[in-house]
Amino acid sequence: MADSTASAAPQPAHPADRPVYVIGAGPGGLAVAQALRARGLRAVVLERAGHVGDSWRRHYDRLRLHTTRRLSALPGLAMPRRFGRWVSRDDVVRYLEKYVEYHQLEIVTGVEVFRVERASDGGWLLHASGGRELTGSAVVVATGYNHTPRVPDWPGRAAYAGEFRHAAEYRDAAPYAGRDVLVVGVGNTGAEIAVDLVEGGASRVRLSVRTVPHIVRRSTAGWPAQYNGVLIRRLPARLVDRMARPLARISVPDLSARGLPRPDTGLLTRAAEGAVPVQDVGLIDAVRSGRVEVVAAVDGFEDGKVLLADGTRLAPDAVIAATGYLRGLEGLVGHLDVLDDRGRPVVRGGSAPAAAPGLYFTGFTNPISGMLRELSLDAGRIAKAVAKHEGTAVSRLPG
């Protein structure tokens, strides 16, 4: 097994040596590599960073999974009970490192793949850092849902001299103690950062909201919200939307007076559009108590102030933009006609695009049933598809 912390690069493949190349050593890439290995197929995972789980290492300190330990484990290795029900960021990283060791996965770090092309013989040619050209029988793209921080093109943003950073740079509340902070965006990241700032001693925390989210309790009477997500994921959206409304009224207080009315769009309809519910880890109480103040959407920046959609002008000490991420796939595979108009893969899991058989994607959706659970399911589907369609061309493991 290649050292998962080394920077050694793979050698150009011999014509008879055509592994499946997996791009990205996060949970999705590792799960696919394990599923392929379980079928006796050689998978080489290429990771641009110096270690596995790089994006997880860069998350904010207080992060814990919003999905349960049991439903967050990857195929073939349970998460230890000592991790608790809601697994911490650091324990996720430890688990990924152990996963590589336990399954003897072939990981090569320090290699960034810039472009994937169809090879003349029907395989795949990967153009990577250092001028490397690697040839594989199939390619799995697992570069991650949160790949490239997205910052809206707000008027005046470039000239704004105040402290501004994307949530990807946020680690903890210590630098903001005693300061006035505006958090922009109320997805799970923005909501949790706002709570972290309040608990960490920020003097004032305001949360800028453009689209009101659905808020759900992470667990109700011991029943995790994820279990509901698993149960309803294949039901008609209109049915789930109707079912969710009375449940929300029972479990989540009306926050309209504090600037967070209940959404007009249904819960599953919104989730299908990519906006999963915000799981409450303290936001409800913080908003009810006034410690987190909800304000209007940001419209721009002017004269050192933040302009809101309702005409308000704010002068916070710091702005943290929890405005999401781009998939960042255009340079890698955009020329292959495999992305939609929003830059997302047109297929996932065991389905390859009609224009690019042998090319697979995992981890580019945000399912209500839990990302890690769906990555595990995708891994099995991809391995099955590769074995069926590209199996005779893939390098086999010895034994």
Sequence positions of predicted segments:
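N-terminal glycine-rich dinucleotide-binding loop that anchors FAD/FMN and/or NAD(P) in oxidoreductases
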Residues: 59-84, 225-239
